[in-house]
C-alpha cells in the first residue's frame, strides 16, 4: 500500500487487458496519481471503465493506438472521469465505444477541462447520457456533431452547467428514442447559438429546465416540435434573458401538468403566442410569465384556471393587452392598475375589479391596460357632419383625441375650449389623460358695406 501511495504516473504498453477496471485508478488506491497512459494494448476484453479515473489528482489520461482483435466487450463508461477536477489533457482515440450502453456522468465535474475531442466516438449503442458533461465549467469546445443518438433515451442534464461552452452542434442528432430532456442545456450561460430545429421529441415526456439559464441565446427554433407526449414543461425557458423570439404556437400541451416558471425571467421576449395551448391538464402555472418585462401582449384563448397560479403575471410591466378565456378565472400578479374591456368599453379601475368582472364573462374577453376616457364635444349651436349637435369620443389614456370641426351658419369656428367662458383653449397635441367636455367657440360673421 505504501508503494501505491507514491505512484504518480502509470504507463501500460503492449499488454492485454481484460475484465472490469471499474474504480481502478481512483484516489482511494492511487492517492497522488497524476497521469495514466494506455497505448498499443489489446482492450477487447475490457468490460467496464466505470469510475475508473474518477479522482481529484489526475491531470492527464492517454488511451490511444490500441487494438481490438475481437469485438469489444466494453459496456459501461459511467462516471469514468467524474469529478476529475484537475484533468486538463485527455486523448481517448484508442477506445472502441461501439458496445457501450451507458455514458452517464462520464465527464461530469471535469471542471478544468477546456477542450474535448469525441469526434471518433461510436455512440450507436448508448441509451443513457444523463449528466454526461454536467458541470464541466471550463469546457469551451466539444465536437459531438457525429454522435449517433438513435438509441439514447435519457439526455437529462447532459450539458448542465457547461458555463463556458460557446458552440454546440447537435443539429443532426436523432432524438426519436429520447424520453427525458430534464435540464439538458440548463445554465449553458455562454451558448450563443443552438440548432434543435430537427429534434424529434415525440417520445419526450420530461422537459423541465431544458433551456433554463441559457442567458445569451437570442433565438431558438422549436416551432416544429411534436410535444404531445410531454407532461412537464416547468422552468423550461426560465431566465433565457436574451431570447427575443420564441415560436411555441404549435406546441401540443394536452398532456402537460405543470407550466410553473415556464417563461419566467425571459426579459427580452416581446411576443409570445400561446393562444393554442391546451391547459386542461395543467395544475400549476405559478410564476409562468414572471418578469417577462418586455412582453406587450398575451393571448390566453384556451387557458383554464389551474390549482396553482401564484404570481403568474408578476413583473409583466410592459403588458398592455390581455385576451383571456372565460375559463381562466384569476390573474395572479397582474399589474394593479386600470384596465378596460375593449369590446364593451367597461372601465376596471384595479386588479380586483378586473378579476370580479371577468369571472362574470361567458366568452373570451380582451382587456387593455389604461384608463377609459371620454371627450364630449358640444357644438354650442353648431352641428357636425352628421347633423349632431354633440359628439362623444372614447379613447384610452395616452392616446390622442381627434380634432373635429363643426359648422354654424353665419359664424366661423374659433376653436375648442374647456369652459363656457372660452378662457382655457384645449390642446389636441397632448395625449389624453382625463375625461373632459369641450365647448365650441363661434364668432359671428359680419358683412361690411362700404358706400361707393
Q: For the regions a protein language model found, what residue spans apply to each?
A:
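Structural signature of tandem-repeat unit edges
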Residues: 5-17, 30-47, 56-75, 85-101, ...
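Short beta-strand elements of solenoid repeat domains
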Residues: 82-83, 105-109, 131-135, 157-161, ...
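Small-residue (G/S/T/A) turn/hinge positions that recur once per unit in extracellular repeat modules
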Residues: 16-24, 48, 52, 76, ...
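Secondary-structure capping and domain/repeat boundary segments
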Residues: 371-452
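Signature tryptophan residues that serve as conserved aromatic anchors
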Residues: 173, 225, 289, 339, ...
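Extracellular/surface-exposed low-complexity segments
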Residues: 321-375, 415-417, 443
Amino acid at each position: 500500500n505504501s508503494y501505491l501511495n507514491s505512484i504518480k504516473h502509470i504507463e501500460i504498453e503492449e499488454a492485454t487487458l481484460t475484465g472490469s477496471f471499474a474504480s481502478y485508478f481512483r484516489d482511494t488506491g492511487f492517492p497522488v496519481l497524476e497521469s495514466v497512459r494506455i497505448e498499443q494494448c489489446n482492450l477487447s476484453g475490457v468490460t467496464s471503465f466505470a469510475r475508473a479515473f474518477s479522482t481529484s489528482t489526475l491531470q492527464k489520461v492517454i488511451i490511444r493506438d490500441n487494438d481490438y482483435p475481437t469485438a469489444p466487450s466494453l459496456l459501461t463508461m459511467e462516471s469514468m472521469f467524474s469529478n476529475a477536477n484537475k484533468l486538463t489533457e485527455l486523448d481517448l482515440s484508442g477506445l472502441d465505444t461501439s458496445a457501450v450502453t451507458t455514458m452517464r456522468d462520464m465527464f461530469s465535474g471535469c471542471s478544468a477541462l477546456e477542450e474535448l475531442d469525441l469526434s471518433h466516438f461510436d455512440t450507436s449503442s448508448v441509451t443513457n447520457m444523463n449528466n454526461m458533461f454536467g458541470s464541466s465549467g471550463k469546457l469551451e469546445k466539444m465536437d459531438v456533431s457525429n454522435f449517433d443518438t438513435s438509441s439514447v433515451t435519457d439526455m437529462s442534464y447532459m450539458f448542465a452547467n457547461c458555463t463556458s461552452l460557446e458552440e454546440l452542434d447537435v443539429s443532426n442528432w436523432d432524438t426519436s428514442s429520447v424520453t427525458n430532456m430534464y435540464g439538458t442545456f440548463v445554465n449553458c450561460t455562454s451558448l450563443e447559438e443552438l440548432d434543435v430545429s430537427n429534434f424529434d421529441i415525440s417520445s419526450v415526456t420530461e422537459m423541465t429546465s431544458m433551456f433554463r439559464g441559457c442567458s445569451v441565446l437570442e433565438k431558438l427554433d422549436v416551432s416544429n416540435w411534436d410535444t404531445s407526449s410531454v407532461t412537464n414543461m416547468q422552468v423550461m425557458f426560465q431566465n433565457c434573458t436574451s431570447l427575443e423570439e420564441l415560436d411555441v404556437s404549435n406546441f401540443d400541451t394536452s398532456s402537460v401538468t405543470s407550466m410553473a416558471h415556464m417563461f419566467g425571467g425571459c426579459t427580452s421576449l416581446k411576443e409570445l403566442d400561446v393562444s393554442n395551448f391546451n391547459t386542461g391538464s395543467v395544475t400549476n402555472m405559478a410564476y409562468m410569465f414572471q418578469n417577462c418585462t418586455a412582453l406587450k401582449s398575451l393571448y390566453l384563448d384556451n387557458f383554464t384556471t389551474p390549482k396553482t397560479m401564484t404570481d403568474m403575471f408578476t413583473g409583466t410591466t410592459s403588458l398592455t393587452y390581455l385576451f383571456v378565456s372565460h375559463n381562466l378565472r384569476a390573474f395572479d400578479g397582474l399589474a394593479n392598475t386600470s384596465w378596460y374591456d375593449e369590446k364593451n368599453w367597461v372601465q376596471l379601475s384595479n386588479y380586483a375589479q378586473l378579476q370580479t368582472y371577468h369571472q362574470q364573462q361567458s366568452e373570451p374577453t380582451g382587456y387593455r391596460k389604461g384608463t377609459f376616457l371620454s371627450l364630449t364635444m358640444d357644438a354650442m349651436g353648431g352641428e357636425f357632419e352628421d347633423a349632431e349637435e354633440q359628439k362623444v369620443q372614447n379613447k384610452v389614456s395616452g392616446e390622442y383625441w381627434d380634432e373635429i370641426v363643426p359648422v354654424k351658419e353665419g359664424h366661423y369656428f374659433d376653436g375648442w375650449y374647456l369652459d363656457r367662458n372660452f378662457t382655457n383653449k384645449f390642446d389636441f397635441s397632448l395625449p389624453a389623460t382625463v375625461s373632459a367636455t369641450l365647448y365650441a367657440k363661434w364668432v359671428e360673421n359680419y358683412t361690411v358695406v362700404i358706400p361707393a
